[in-house]
Protein backbone atom coordinates (compact mmCIF):
# COMPACT_ATOMS: atom_id res chain seq x y z
CA UNK A 1 0.00 0.00 0.00
CA UNK A 2 2.98 2.28 0.37
CA UNK A 3 3.24 2.76 -3.38
CA UNK A 4 -0.46 3.68 -3.61
CA UNK A 5 -0.18 6.16 -0.72
CA UNK A 6 2.94 7.71 -2.23
CA UNK A 7 1.38 8.07 -5.68
CA UNK A 8 -1.95 9.30 -4.28
CA UNK A 9 -0.26 12.10 -2.36
CA UNK A 10 1.73 13.48 -5.31
CA UNK A 11 -1.13 15.49 -6.87
CA UNK A 12 -4.46 16.93 -5.78
CA UNK A 13 -6.31 14.27 -7.80
CA UNK A 14 -4.95 10.84 -8.70
CA UNK A 15 -6.88 8.25 -10.67
CA UNK A 16 -5.73 4.64 -10.79
CA UNK A 17 -7.00 3.29 -14.07
CA UNK A 18 -6.65 0.63 -16.73
CA UNK A 19 -6.26 1.80 -20.30
CA UNK A 20 -8.90 -0.66 -21.53
CA UNK A 21 -11.53 0.06 -18.86
CA UNK A 22 -14.56 2.01 -20.10
CA UNK A 23 -15.48 3.18 -16.58
CA UNK A 24 -11.95 4.48 -16.07
CA UNK A 25 -12.30 6.42 -19.31
CA UNK A 26 -15.63 7.89 -18.17
CA UNK A 27 -14.23 8.99 -14.80
CA UNK A 28 -11.17 10.58 -16.41
CA UNK A 29 -13.46 12.50 -18.80
CA UNK A 30 -15.57 13.67 -15.87
CA UNK A 31 -12.54 15.22 -14.18
CA UNK A 32 -11.22 16.76 -17.40
CA UNK A 33 -14.65 18.30 -18.05
CA UNK A 34 -14.59 19.79 -14.54
CA UNK A 35 -11.32 21.53 -15.42
CA UNK A 36 -9.20 19.21 -13.30
CA UNK A 37 -5.90 17.73 -14.51
CA UNK A 38 -5.58 14.53 -12.52
CA UNK A 39 -2.51 12.35 -12.38
CA UNK A 40 -3.40 9.11 -14.13
CA UNK A 41 -1.75 5.83 -13.17
CA UNK A 42 -2.52 3.21 -15.81
CA UNK A 43 -1.87 0.10 -13.75
CA UNK A 44 -2.01 -2.19 -16.78
CA UNK A 45 0.96 -0.29 -18.21
CA UNK A 46 2.92 0.19 -14.98
CA UNK A 47 5.71 -2.18 -14.02
CA UNK A 48 4.29 -2.31 -10.48
CA UNK A 49 0.71 -2.62 -11.72
CA UNK A 50 -0.03 -5.96 -10.08
CA UNK A 51 1.25 -4.68 -6.72
CA UNK A 52 -0.81 -1.51 -7.09
CA UNK A 53 -3.92 -3.50 -7.99
CA UNK A 54 -3.41 -5.75 -4.97
CA UNK A 55 -2.99 -2.71 -2.70
CA UNK A 56 -6.14 -1.10 -4.10
CA UNK A 57 -8.08 -4.31 -3.45
CA UNK A 58 -6.83 -4.28 0.16
CA UNK A 59 -8.17 -0.72 0.48
CA UNK A 60 -11.59 -2.03 -0.44
CA UNK A 61 -11.67 -1.01 -4.09
CA UNK A 62 -14.01 -3.38 -5.84
CA UNK A 63 -13.56 -3.25 -8.74
CA UNK A 64 -10.01 -2.02 -8.34
CA UNK A 65 -10.29 0.60 -11.08
CA UNK A 66 -11.07 3.36 -11.44
CA UNK A 67 -9.90 4.29 -7.95
CA UNK A 68 -9.97 8.02 -7.24
CA UNK A 69 -7.95 9.85 -4.61
CA UNK A 70 -8.53 13.53 -3.85
CA UNK A 71 -6.17 15.36 -1.53
CA UNK A 72 -4.34 12.10 -0.88
CA UNK A 73 -7.49 10.42 0.46
CA UNK A 74 -9.37 7.58 -1.15
CA UNK A 75 -12.71 8.89 -2.43
CA UNK A 76 -14.01 5.76 -4.10
CA UNK A 77 -14.57 3.98 -7.35
CA UNK A 78 -16.82 4.97 -10.25
CA UNK A 79 -20.17 4.62 -8.43
CA UNK A 80 -19.09 6.75 -5.48
CA UNK A 81 -17.47 9.40 -7.66
CA UNK A 82 -20.56 9.68 -9.86
CA UNK A 83 -22.80 9.96 -6.79
CA UNK A 84 -20.60 12.74 -5.39
CA UNK A 85 -20.68 14.51 -8.74
CA UNK A 86 -24.46 14.31 -9.04
CA UNK A 87 -25.10 15.61 -5.52
CA UNK A 88 -22.53 18.43 -5.84
CA UNK A 89 -20.10 17.13 -3.23
CA UNK A 90 -17.33 16.31 -5.70
CA UNK A 91 -16.81 19.95 -6.63
CA UNK A 92 -16.46 20.84 -2.94
CA UNK A 93 -13.84 18.11 -2.42
CA UNK A 94 -11.94 19.29 -5.47
CA UNK A 95 -11.91 22.90 -4.26
CA UNK A 96 -10.74 21.87 -0.78
CA UNK A 97 -7.90 19.83 -2.31
CA UNK A 98 -6.83 22.75 -4.51
CA UNK A 99 -7.72 20.94 -7.73
CA UNK A 100 -10.28 23.60 -8.74
CA UNK A 101 -9.80 27.33 -8.53
CA UNK A 102 -13.37 28.50 -9.13
From Swiss-Prot:
It is found in: Cytoplasm; Nucleus. Keywords: 2Fe-2S, Cytoplasm, Iron, Iron-sulfur, Metal-binding, Nucleus, Redox-active center. One of its GO terms (biological process) is negative regulation of transcription by RNA polymerase II. It comes from the Eukaryota. Pfam families: Glutaredoxin. A motif (Responsive for interaction with TGA factors) lies at residues 99-102. InterPro entries: GlrX-like_pln_2, Glutaredoxin, Thioredoxin-like_sf. One of its GO terms (molecular function) is metal ion binding. GO terms for cellular component: cytoplasm; nucleus. Residues 1-101 form the Glutaredoxin domain. Its main location: cytoplasm. Belongs to the glutaredoxin family. CC-type subfamily. May only reduce GSH-thiol disulfides, but not protein disulfides. This is Monothiol glutaredoxin-S10. It comes from Arabidopsis thaliana (Mouse-ear cress).
